[in-house]
């Protein structure tokens, strides 16, 4: 006797769950400009690589003879797959089934995929829409009680932050636990126009606020990108999937591996003549840092993260001679490159990511210090600043720093882990000290200036005298700066750095686990 009847029943049940919330709900999803969860997974991963786990989990309806009438799937689809040939775990919310809320959730599925990714040491991608399995008021009626708030399994979400790359894609409105799951990642993306993210959505907020909000007003992509709650926003879902794939391409599968070298596609000895005069002599003039980064890393490899948040610091991943690196750079277009409170938060999180996944850090420093003034003090910039510095000083990954213009004050000192040996270079445009002369002279020579018959002339005299003494060559004479280089040699030095750094990258968990 064969087992064909049981296999037929299995196929029948799988066919029911693949209908998701039904034709009407699927049409509504498409009419809203959004893909279904199964379409999303198909477009995200390598062709034919997805293997679903829990394919017939859901809520079953039986007749009086205990024969199955209908099977409504759980509102999460999950499984294993491959991206660029590498094993990953994927979970996606099915918004066509009760909007992704708790009363259609089988919590064990969420717990399983988090544990699966952790124990098999593979990256995890969450496709999030709705409340992500979070609570609904209807749950009170269906369970007959009100639950004391708790997030079962959150300890595994925390553990995964220190163990495997996690990516979150917000592909519709996400609220409550869904928003938390999106934020608790190393890299997160929203899709413009169709995505929104909030602790509580407009129906809740509008009951309590005199101002009435729609989804985009309250938690649209631009709000969340500027707040640092997400890392990127794209025009389409397919672009979001491409961002996820590209982000993962720079990282190992887990902390128990090192980032793999990619194809060598660029000449390590390439010299960019435009770097020779990239930094203006006039310190009042600014310049654009991104073209400088793009000229020294492998062509087309720079992948920026968090562009609209903490804008005085640029962060991203790149390749140098095929090796993945983490790149930080000051952006003088915003606050002259000074560290604001949000820039410090951005640096802390980025450095922690590099440390967690064994990425060498390259920093192009042009930092005049922390932002000063009343608003800066009210933002708590000094506490955020020392948190960023602490993250840097806790790193064990190799560092290579280039002081391309300013390095002043406490924030300027945070251009490397001062407790470890690092590669450090200065361009001829480098200038450093406790304070920039432009502000420091007034404080240090106030008595001389007050006593001078011509205050302006005295100021110019002191400034001219000190300018000669602060030459980078004076610092190099005493080995305060290890080497001054021709800016056009920067790429060659970087290629040598990553080659030397590659064998000393360790594996395993960081000494301190990363937090979102």
Q: In which residue ranges do the predicted regions lie?
A:
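Ligand-binding clefts of soluble mixed alpha/beta catalytic domains
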Residues: 1-516
């Amino acid at each position: 006797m064969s087992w064909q009847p049981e296999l037929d029943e299995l196929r029948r049940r799988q066919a029911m769950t693949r209908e998701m919330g039904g034709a009407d709900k699927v049409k509504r999803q498409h009419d809203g400009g959004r893909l279904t969860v199964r379409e999303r997974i198909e477009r995200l991963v390598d062709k034919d690589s997805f293997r679903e786990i829990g394919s017939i989990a859901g809520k079953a309806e039986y007749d009086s003879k205990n024969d199955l009438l209908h099977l409504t799937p759980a509102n999460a689809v999950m499984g294993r797959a491959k991206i660029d040939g590498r094993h990953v775990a994927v979970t996606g919310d099915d918004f066509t089934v009760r909007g992704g809320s708790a009363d259609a959730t089988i919590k064990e599925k969420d717990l399983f995929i988090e544990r699966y990714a952790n124990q098999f040491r593979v990256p995890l991608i969450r496709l999030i829409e709705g409340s992500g399995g979070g609570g609904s008021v209807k749950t009170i009626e269906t369970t007959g009680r009100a639950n004391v708030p708790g997030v079962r399994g959150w300890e595994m979400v925390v553990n995964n932050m220190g163990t495997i790359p996690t990516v979150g894609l917000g592909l519709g409105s996400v609220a409550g636990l869904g928003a938390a799951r999106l934020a608790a990642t190393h890299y997160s993306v929203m899709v413009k126009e169709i995505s929104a993210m909030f602790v509580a959505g407009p129906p809740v907020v509008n009951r309590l606020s005199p101002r009435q909000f729609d989804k985009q007003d309250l938690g649209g992509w631009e709000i969340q990108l500027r707040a640092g709650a997400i890392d990127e926003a794209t025009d389409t879902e397919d672009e979001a999937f491409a961002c996820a794939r590209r982000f993962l391409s720079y990282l190992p599968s887990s902390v128990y591996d090192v980032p793999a070298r990619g194809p060598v596609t660029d000449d390590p000895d390439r010299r960019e003549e435009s770097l020779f005069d990239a930094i203006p002599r006039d310190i009042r003039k600014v310049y654009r840092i991104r073209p400088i980064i793009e000229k020294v890393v492998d062509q087309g490899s720079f992948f920026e993260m968090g562009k609209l948040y903490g804008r005085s610091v640029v962060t991203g991943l790149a390749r140098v001679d095929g090796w993945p690196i983490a790149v930080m750079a000051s952006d003088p277009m915003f606050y002259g490159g000074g560290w604001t409170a949000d820039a410090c938060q951005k640096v802390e999180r980025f450095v922690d990511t590099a440390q967690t996944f064994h990425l060498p850090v390259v920093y192009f420093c042009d930092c005049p210090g922390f932002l000063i003034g009343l608003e800066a003090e009210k933002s708590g910039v000094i506490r955020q600043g020392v948190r960023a510095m602490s993250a840097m000083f806790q790193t064990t990954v190799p560092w290579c720093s280039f002081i391309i213009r300013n390095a002043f004050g406490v924030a300027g000192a945070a251009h490397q882990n001062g407790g470890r040996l690092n590669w450090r270079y200065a361009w001829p445009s480098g200038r450093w000290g406790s304070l920039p002369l432009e502000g420091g002279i007034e404080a240090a020579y106030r008595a001389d200036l007050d006593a001078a018959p011509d205050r302006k002339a005295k100021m110019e005299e002191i400034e001219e005298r000190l300018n000669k003494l602060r030459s980078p060559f004076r610092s190099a004479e005493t080995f305060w700066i290890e080497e001054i280089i021709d800016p056009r040699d920067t790429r060659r030095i970087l290629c040598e750095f990553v080659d030397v750094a590659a064998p000393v990258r360790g594996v395993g968990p960081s000494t301190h686990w990363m937090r979102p």
